[in-house]
Amino acid sequence: TYTIRELASQEMKNSAGATWDAATAGNAIGIWTASFGDQIDVVVSNNDGMGMSMFNAWAKDNKVPTFGYDANSDAVAAIAEGYGGTISQHADVQAYLTLRVLRNALDGVDIDTGIGTADDAGNCLVEGEDYRYSEEDRSYYALNIAVTAENYNDFTDSTRVYDKVANQLDESKSPSKKVWLNIYNASDNFLSS
């Protein structure tokens, strides 16, 4: 039986107001360990930058499982050194879904081709495992994946193409197109906020 109790929390802003600041998180774990010592059994962070800062500053030496979010390359590699795990937002599937919907529109084929229905090259994702479709939103969503000691090696090569959708389409049926695709958040301030 486990008891979950929040010992402390803090908004992680630096003096310039930037949020989710790794250095602030590293400093916070020092303050918290001075106050709570061996009462800290696990560290959970909203991102791997802060998680890795707390892991390197204290949790690694004290063998306290630390978990983050984003599957940053340093966090994935640190799983071999005791970092508890992270969450991949499945960026490869996010990119594939975006480009595949665009490709399907350009080719004039069913929107689900190569997503939930195999295309001529055999590309097909698994709904509920790789993505979900919302009829109400008319949107595809990549599903997050837990990255743990059991599977972290699958996430060490960021250039690896996702096997389920790695096959090239026939150029004669899907000719090359010149497309400008610009993606950013609505406020266009993600890195500066």
PLM segments and residue spans:
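A residue-level marker of the well-folded mature domains of exported/periplasmic proteins
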Residues: T1-S193
